[in-house]
């Protein structure tokens, strides 16, 4: 039974590295339980670390953190300890906690130095480069500024109305207005915020929200309806006033308005964020990690392939997708942590 459990763990680790994620969570849980039952605490701890890594990869941050808390760090093999701290750093980065992420990266670097394995040191260096890369863009009064993770964290705590285009919501102090399921309202809000303190012309709003090149009366009528819906969502944080040429945001309490946008935007940014780890991914694993349908992933991959951003290896079920070249591609805000509903 012990040898079989170790073989299952090895197979699960290979599956994780090759991004063959189907059924992997159950396989790791089974292997971890069997190894612990046989008293193989080192490999059981290693299986727990792999569980946390998988949960982070698929965006389940609370579960990943809970698994890390159950691990006995002393039981972990020396080669597993840097990765364990990298998982902790990844959780902190996704939650926009720069200090916690930096501390975890420092511990990962110290842990990687002990076994003297060059590949571990390289993995830590790659994670630190991702931490140091721009994590977001501040758009305010017509100006754009790149922010690192600490800058994003400070912005989220500032006393302003922040249109968070990474998580599709409006932040005003402790109040959150989620708009993730309302792309038209989010597009209108962002256009209004980017124009503030001025007004946004109706033509701009129609183009941003409805992609209408030649607006007719039906488009204008729909715009009035959607602006009315947006007013209801923004109260009591802000109002929307009609002007001669469009609409303008009116924040309550004299707060200023800014937009937090991802450092890189465009269609299928989430796919590129995952592929930026340099691994070869199956389309099914990408769908699992992004929590979208396989058909949506296939369409996105085909579009990225036509644009020269990705390429594939293998055929049929063995096909894997890789990014062609995206050095330093920042992923932190492209794969955000879930935001609690108001």
Task: Give the ranges of each region predicted by the language model.
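DNA-binding patch around the recognition helix
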Residues: 216, 220-258, 302-322
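Alpha-solenoid helical repeat architecture
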Residues: 1-11, 19-23, 35-51, 59, ...
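Short boundary/linker motifs that mark transitions into or out of structured domains
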Residues: 121, 126-186, 190, 232, ...
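Alpha-helical linker/edge segments of TPR/alpha-solenoid repeat scaffolds
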Residues: 17-20, 52-53, 57-60, 89-98, ...
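Short amphipathic alpha-helical interface segments
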Residues: 185-198, 265-281
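Short, amphipathic alpha-helical interaction segments positioned at domain boundaries
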Residues: 255-269, 326-342
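Positively charged, aromatic-enriched patches within helix-turn-helix-type DNA-binding elements
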Residues: 188, 192-222
């Amino acid at each position: 039974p012990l040898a079989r459990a170790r073989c299952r763990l090895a197979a699960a680790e290979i599956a994780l590295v090759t991004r063959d994620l189907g059924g992997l969570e159950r396989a790791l849980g089974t292997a971890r339980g069997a190894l612990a039952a046989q008293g193989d605490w080192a490999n059981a701890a290693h299986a727990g670390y792999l569980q946390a890594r998988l949960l982070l990869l698929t965006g389940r941050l609370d579960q990943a953190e809970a698994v890390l808390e159950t691990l006995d760090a002393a039981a972990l093999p020396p080669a597993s300890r840097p990765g364990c701290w990298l998982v902790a750093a990844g959780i902190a980065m996704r939650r926009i906690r720069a200090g916690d992420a930096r501390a975890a990266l420092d511990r990962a670097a110290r842990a990687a130095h002990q076994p003297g394995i060059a590949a571990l040191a390289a993995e830590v260096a790659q994670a630190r480069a991702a931490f140091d890369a721009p994590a977001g863009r501040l758009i305010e009064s017509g100006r754009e500024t790149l922010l690192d993770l600490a800058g994003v964290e400070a912005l989220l705590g500032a006393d302003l109305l922040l249109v968070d285009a990474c998580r599709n919501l409006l932040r005003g102090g402790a109040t959150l207005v989620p708009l993730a399921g309302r792309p038209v309202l989010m597009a209108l809000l962002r256009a209004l915020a980017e124009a503030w303190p001025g007004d946004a012309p109706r033509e701009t709003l129609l183009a941003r929200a409805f992609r209408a090149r030649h607006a007719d009366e039906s488009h204008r009528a729909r715009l009035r309806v959607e602006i009315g819906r947006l007013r209801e969502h923004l109260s009591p944080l802000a109002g929307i006033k009609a002007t001669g040429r469009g609409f303008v945001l009116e924040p309550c309490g004299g707060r200023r308005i800014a937009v937090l946008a991802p450092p890189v935007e465009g269609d299928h940014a989430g796919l590129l964020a995952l592929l930026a780890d340099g691994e070869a991914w199956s389309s099914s694993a990408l769908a699992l990690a992004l929590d979208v349908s396989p058909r949506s992933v296939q369409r996105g991959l085909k579009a990225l392939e036509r644009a020269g951003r990705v390429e594939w290896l293998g055929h049929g079920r063995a096909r894997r997708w890789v990014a062609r070249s995206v050095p330093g591609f920042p992923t932190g805000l492209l794969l955000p942590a879930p935001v609690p509903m108001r």
